[in-house]
């Protein structure tokens, strides 16, 4: 609106007095740093003249031009030559806006025409364009120059003017525009979206367009969390001959402040800090945090521990030579359906301060990284941030990772290691930060995990991608009656539980309510329905509340920066060398390739464990804890336990067969065959009736070969085939392999090896033909 001259001059005198009394040092610093915007704290205005502060917030258009004139005059009083003719010192605001600190969702029509502070994350940035402020035109006929000023809705110097260039003067003479004498200012539009962790569940995130001009352009980039101070205005719709009552709203910025990682930090009470330190001093702190992560999920203790370390993260470092050392931990879970992989992702979403969820089929490469889009109104190119850029310094959860296209999966390679997104499209070259942890869940390539194949063949992902995951867990659906009984009991307790108000649980479609920052309860209260009956002589395993767990993880993640000690460095280097040797040995076969990235993984895990203990140093104990987790992820113990149970079942079946009469007859037949093994006729009879030969041979040696030697043979033989990726091998080579690599006091005889191979053939695991063993 157009402010009367008398009112504007009165406000100018008041503001000059205010600046002389409180902001002379800031104005001198402005001149010294060659800036053209003075930032004023609204609290200082409130202390100087209380009533004016509230009027500035409610009706800023009346005061903005007076403030700029006062700041310009105060600057000229300090240095008359600092500003050129026609230049102004712009004014921006900061401070505590009380009820006017809003998110894009809360920015309603009540705030139109007033000054607000909008907090959110930048999702789109347009290119910086020049906007004309003053045009100069020359008339060749008269030799005179004509000036024209331009104002739009973003200007505070009066009513908006037309934007049409004059082509003739008042007398009808032609005018020529002198572009070199015209004045322009930088202009850029941004899109601010509400932060993902504060978005209402089940609803699309809201956004607001922001106009940044002059020195505010390029002050932020997509993915940055910002507080934008500005005036909320409504723009009339472009209607063709009809009246449109719906208006488009924009925010005209006068100050943009970047939010740091502590912006959304919870408020800690003294009791909270004492409780956090008490938990860190406990010997079972790691187990307690893992148990509290997702108490509704039974088992998976090692995976829960890995998730705790993942949320804490390591220490990010940027060396002087420009090298970036990643501190975030990436994790992947592969396994059978219905083993709570997706539920673990949901638990991360519920606890992590910043987490964005997506799925493999519903995500594209540009949707995860960044995209170059066209503005619907101007048609110009603009950069739009993807999920990983929006989750900067957070966690990205990708479910159904195996369903993602190969082209889209390649797009996240750079993010997972370099933690940046580089775009070079449509004339735009930019590099955006994407410092996030990736947690992926996938099913095996055949639907269920095939234990006879290597982990790499089951997963079906390239090594270039697998090596970027610090941890790879194989989650199996074990058919165990005891475990199944405990899982069913646990799940039934979950379904029977109701909270104190008798409700089954919160509805995801309820309006979002911000979490209070009051003192948090430490432990979950015992509930017989939820936690089960206490057994005699057994205490209830306590779990932390979700609110306190969030505070603990946030405190340990952002307040603690551990440093590696010499003894921890030596232990990590020694363990890495052992892992490399084991990776090249024929006795072992891990889920992940052992590369130099594995060494950095151990360092990150040890650092995260030190954070969990609130320690300023990474000790040898932290390195040992990281190595235990690393060994479980690489040489997954669940596979060995499952094979042991199958081996025990086979031994029981063999023992029962030995006690039957057919077993005794088989032994007698086997002895007769051994006595005539050089007879050609007997060899022909063996090939004519293979069933009579295979069965007794197994029964003969199953009674004489110990269970340990049987297990060693199958383990060494299977690992040799997986390590060298062989489909067939000669029996002579098998004898060499098992006798050179087997752990035992005596060597395997040829008959012993043949009997064991025939047993594998009966189990449909191998096929023996022409002196060769083929893997089925």
Curated annotation (Swiss-Prot):
Belongs to the MCM family. It is an enzyme of class 3 (hydrolase). Its EC number is 3.6.4.12. It catalyses: ATP + H2O = ADP + phosphate + H(+). It comes from Arabidopsis thaliana (Mouse-ear cress). Keywords: ATP-binding, Cell cycle, DNA replication, DNA-binding, Helicase, Hydrolase, Nucleotide-binding, Nucleus. The keyword ATP-binding applies. Component of the minichromosome maintenance (MCM) complex, a heterotetramer composed of MCM2, MCM3, MCM4, MCM5, MCM6 and MCM7. Interacts with ETG1. Residues 647-661 have a biased composition (Basic and acidic residues). Expressed in root meristem, shoot apex and flower buds. This is DNA replication licensing factor MCM3. GO terms for cellular component: MCM complex; THO complex. It comes from the Eukaryota. Probable component of the MCM2-7 complex (MCM complex) that may function as a DNA helicase and which is essential to undergo a single round of replication initiation and elongation per cell cycle in eukaryotic cells. GO terms for molecular function: ATP binding; ATP hydrolysis activity; DNA binding; helicase activity. Residues 686-697 have a biased composition (Acidic residues). SMART domains: AAA (SM00382), MCM (SM00350). It is found in: Nucleus. One of its GO terms (biological process) is DNA replication initiation. It holds the Pfam family MCM. Residues 285-491 form the MCM domain.
């Amino acid at each position: 609106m157009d402010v009367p001259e008398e009112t504007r001059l009165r406000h100018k005198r008041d503001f000059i007095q205010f600046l002389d009394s409180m902001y002379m040092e800031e104005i001198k610093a402005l001149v010294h740093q060659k800036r053209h915007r003075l930032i004023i704290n609204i609290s200082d205005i409130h202390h100087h003249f209380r009533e004016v502060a509230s009027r500035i917030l409610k009706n800023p258009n009346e005061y903005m031009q007076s403030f700029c004139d006062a700041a310009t005059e105060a600057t000229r009083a300090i240095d008359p030559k600092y500003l050129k003719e026609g230049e102004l010192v712009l004014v921006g605001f900061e401070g505590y806006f009380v009820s006017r600190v809003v998110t894009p969702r809360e920015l309603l029509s009540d705030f139109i025409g007033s000054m607000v502070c909008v907090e959110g994350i930048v999702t789109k940035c347009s290119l910086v364009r020049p906007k004309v402020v003053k045009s100069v035109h020359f008339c060749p006929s008269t030799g005179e120059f004509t000036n024209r000023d331009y104002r739009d809705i973003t200007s505070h110097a009066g009513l908006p003017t037309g934007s049409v260039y004059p082509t003739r003067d008042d007398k009808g003479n032609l005018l020529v525009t002198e572009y070199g004498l015209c004045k322009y200012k930088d202009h850029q539009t941004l899109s601010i979206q509400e932060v993902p962790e504060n978005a209402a569940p089940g609803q699309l995130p809201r956004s607001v367009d922001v106009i940044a001009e002059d020195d505010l352009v390029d002050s932020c980039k997509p993915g940055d969390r910002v507080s934008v101070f500005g005036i909320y205005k409504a723009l009339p719709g472009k209607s063709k001959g009809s009246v449109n009552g719906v208006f488009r709203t924009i925010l005209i910025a006068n100050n943009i402040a970047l939010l740091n990682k502590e912006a959304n930090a919870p408020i800690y009470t003294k009791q909270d800090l004492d409780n956090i330190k008490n938990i860190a001093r406990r010997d079972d702190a790691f187990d307690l945090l893992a148990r509290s992560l997702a108490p509704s999920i039974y088992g998976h203790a090692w995976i829960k521990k890995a998730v705790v370390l993942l949320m804490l993260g390591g220490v990010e470092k940027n060396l002087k030579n420009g090298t970036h050392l990643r501190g975030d931990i990436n994790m992947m879970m592969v396994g059978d359906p219905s083993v709570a992989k997706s539920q673990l992702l949901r638990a991360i979403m519920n606890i992590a301060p910043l987490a964005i969820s997506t799925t493999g089929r519903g995500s594209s490469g540009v949707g995860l990284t960044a995209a170059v889009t066209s503005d619907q109104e101007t048609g110009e190119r603009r950069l739009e941030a993807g999920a990983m850029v929006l989750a900067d310094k957070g966690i990205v959860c990708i479910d159904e990772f195996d369903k993602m296209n190969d082209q889209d999966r390649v797009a996240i390679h750079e993010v997972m290691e370099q933690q940046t997104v580089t775009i070079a499209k449509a004339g735009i070259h930019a590099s955006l930060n994407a410092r996030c942890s990736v947690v992926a869940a996938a099913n095996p390539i055949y639907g269920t995990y095939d234990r006879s194949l290597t982990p790499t063949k089951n997963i079906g992902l390239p090594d270039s991608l697998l090596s970027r995951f610090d941890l790879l867990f194989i989650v199996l659906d074990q058919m165990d009656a005891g475990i199944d009984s405990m899982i069913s009991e646990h799940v039934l307790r979950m379904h029977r539980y109701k909270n104190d108000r008798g409700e089954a649980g919160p509805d995801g479609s309820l309006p979002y309510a911000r979490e209070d920052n009051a003192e948090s309860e430490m432990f979950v209260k015992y509930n017989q329905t939820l936690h089960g009956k206490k057994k005699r002589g057994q205490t209830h395993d306590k779990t932390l509340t979700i609110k306190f767990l969030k505070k603990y993880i946030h405190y340990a993640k952002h307040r603690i920066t551990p440093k590696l000690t010499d003894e921890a460095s030596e232990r990590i280097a020694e363990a890495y060398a052992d892992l490399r040797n084991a990776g090249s040995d024929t006795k072992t076969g891990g889920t992940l390739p052992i590369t130099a990235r594995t060494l950095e993984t151990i360092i990150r895990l040890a650092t995260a464990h030190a954070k969990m203990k609130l320690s300023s140093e990474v000790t040898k104990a932290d390195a040992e804890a990281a190595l235990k987790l690393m060994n479980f992820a690489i040489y997954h113990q669940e596979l060995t336990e499952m094979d042991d149970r199958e081996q025990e079942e086979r031994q029981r079946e063999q023992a029962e067969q030995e006690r039957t009469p057919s077993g005794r007859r088989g032994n007698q037949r086997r002895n007769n065959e051994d006595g005539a093994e050089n007879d050609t006729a007997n060899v022909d009879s063996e090939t004519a009736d293979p069933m009579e030969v295979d069965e007794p041979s197994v029964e003969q040696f199953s009674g004489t070969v110990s269970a340990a030697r049987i297990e060693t043979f199958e383990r060494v033989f299977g690992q040799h085939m997986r390590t060298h990726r062989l489909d067939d091998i000669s029996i002579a080579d098998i004898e060499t392999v098992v006798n050179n690599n087997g752990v035992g006091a005596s060597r395997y005889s040829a008959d012993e090896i043949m009997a064991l191979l025939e047993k594998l053939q009966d189990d449909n695991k191998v096929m023996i033909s022409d002196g060769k063993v083929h893997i089925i």
